[in-house]
Structures are given as structure tokens and as C-alpha cells.
Amino acid sequence: MVKTQRVVITPGEPAGIGPDLVVQLAQREWPVELVVCADATLLTDRAAMLGLPLTLRPYSPNSPAQPQTAGILTLLPVALRESVTAGQLAVENGHYVVETLARACDGCLNGEFAALITGPVHKGVINDAGIPFTGHTEFFEERSRAKKVVMMLATEELRVALATTHLPLRDIADAITPALLHEVIAILHHDLRTKFGIAEPRILVCGLNPHAGEGGHMGTEEIGTIIPVLDELRAQGMKLSGPLPADTLFQPKYLDNADAVLAMYHDQGLPVLKYQGFGRGVNITLGLPFIRTSVDHGTALELAGRGEADVGSFITALNLAIKMIVNTQ
């Protein structure tokens, strides 16, 4: 790494395990400076509950970034709206969560931070607070004014990107258009090159229907939409295989010769990845003008403050972000 960079972290839902995980992250040394966008008392209280040492130092944007020292976190303060009891949601703190996301996103956009790592949020409590919120991905897409973003989940062995994300099954076929596929594949290909350092990405593309349509007998989206798009992009030099049946694609025969899989919808690609690497997966938002990774699990309210939360996914998300920073320098 040419120089020390700052990585901003949002712990997510304050009543969940996000603050616990951030405190656990702070127990290690890191080659970047970790800047946590959160309430100071929340972090110190949670550290005390876990019996872990934690010192907070104020964020100073005009001073050089310093590598992370164990037991110390740099704090970018955002105040809670209500006091927090571990495991108990408070509706007003939905506003707090969104404020942390907005400040962290803006800091990435203006160059303060080299990457953003997000902890798990509780979408229900944010919406109950009167804030329309579908998820991190859509929030950052809108706030950064990105033209289009792509959700990708990854473990060390497998990367799965999604052509569509949070859509009902009945709407997915209509959403799979030539324009969408062109856009999604272009973003996936570009970010695999620029953020993952893969010179010539090899992408496996799932079909939409069982058996990838069985030659048109089980659906025509492959023949009418997916195959023509793949042919066009192959003619431009992209290394694309498919459309392949999703029930046979996820095996070494195909995966050993690929850098990523493009699934047509959420529950086509992610069950395999989460089974293969649950607790080690990372959510990456492609197409943003900055690096964003996230844990692949929820708030686990029942574990908050108990010292039982697994920090593995957060560590993987941070390590991946650091690698992506290096690749973009």
C-alpha cells in the first residue's frame, strides 16, 4: 500500500451485534486507519459489556492517516436519538442509522475515506421511523447518484453477482431485459478488472429458467434475451460462458475456470454461496464511485452484548476492502 488510507465503518443497528463486532475489530492491528461513524457512548458501553479494552480518539480529517493500533478506534461522532439497550429496538434510532450511512457515504464521495464497510441494519425499524429504506445498496446508489449498481456476494472461493436483487419472483422475468443485462455485465466486468485486479474476467452466466430454458421448451428468455446479449458482448472481447442451468453451474467443472457467476435473481445464486461459506461471506456493491463491502448477516439482536457474535464476516469484509484499495492505487 503506497500510503496509509482511512476506511470508514458504520456499525449498523445500535441494538444489534454491529457495535460488538466493531469493538472486536478494534482488538487487532490493521494497515489502515479505522474511522467509526457512531455514537461514542454506544461503543464504550458495548466494549465494557464485552470486557474488551477500547480507547476512542477524535477523527481529524486534516491529519495524516495512521495504521490501526489494537484497542484504539478513530471516532467520527453521530449521536443516538434514544439510549440503547442491547437487543431492544428503538424506532427513533432508525434516524441515527441513516445519518451514519449518509455521513460515511459523503466522506467516501469527497475523498476522505478510501472504502466503506457497513454493519447489519434492521430495515424494519428504519421504515417504522418513517424513512423509506430498501437496503444499503439502494441507499448508496441514490445518494451517490450512481447510474446503476450491482450486488455481488463473495467468499474467498466464489463470487456471485445478481442481475436483479429484491424483486418478487413474479416480476423477475419482465425485469430481465437486454438493456439490464448489458448494463449489469458491463459493471461486473469493469469492477472485476479495476477493483479486483483481474485483467480478463471470466464470467459464468446463469439461465433464468429450469435447464436454461431447455431450448425454449421451459421458457424463452434465454433464446430471446440472454443469448443475444452474451453473443454481442463476446464479440466485444468479454469472456462469458452461458447461459448455463443454475442447478449444474455451481460445480468445479465450471467454477474452476471462472472469476464470477452472474445469477439472474437473488435466490438463484445466494443460497449456494451462503451454504458454501456462511459467516465468511462479504456483500460488495459494484458500480459505486467508491469501494463498499459489508457483512452478509443480520443484526442478531439476541446476541448483542453477550460476547457470542462471530466477527469473521466483518474481518473478511475489511480484508477484502483493503485488497480492493491496493488494486485501485
Curated annotation (Swiss-Prot):
GO terms for molecular function: 4-hydroxythreonine-4-phosphate dehydrogenase activity; cobalt ion binding; magnesium ion binding; NAD binding; zinc ion binding. Its EC number is 1.1.1.262. Substrate binds at residues 136-137, 274, 283, 292. SUPFAM superfamilies: Isocitrate/Isopropylmalate dehydrogenase-like. Keywords: Cobalt, Cytoplasm, Magnesium, Metal-binding, NAD, NADP, Oxidoreductase, Pyridoxine biosynthesis, Zinc. One of its GO terms (cellular component) is cytoplasm. Gene3D superfamilies: Isopropylmalate Dehydrogenase. Its cofactor is Zn(2+); Mg(2+); Co(2+). Binds 1 divalent metal cation per subunit. Can use ions such as Zn(2+), Mg(2+) or Co(2+). Pathway: Cofactor biosynthesis; pyridoxine 5'-phosphate biosynthesis; pyridoxine 5'-phosphate from D-erythrose 4-phosphate: step 4/5. Its main location: cytoplasm. A divalent metal cation binds at residues 166, 211, 266. GO terms for biological process: pyridoxal phosphate biosynthetic process; pyridoxine biosynthetic process. It catalyses: 4-(phosphooxy)-L-threonine + NAD(+) = 3-amino-2-oxopropyl phosphate + CO2 + NADH. InterPro entries: PdxA, PdxA_fam. Homodimer. Belongs to the PdxA family. The active site is located at the dimer interface. This is 4-hydroxythreonine-4-phosphate dehydrogenase.
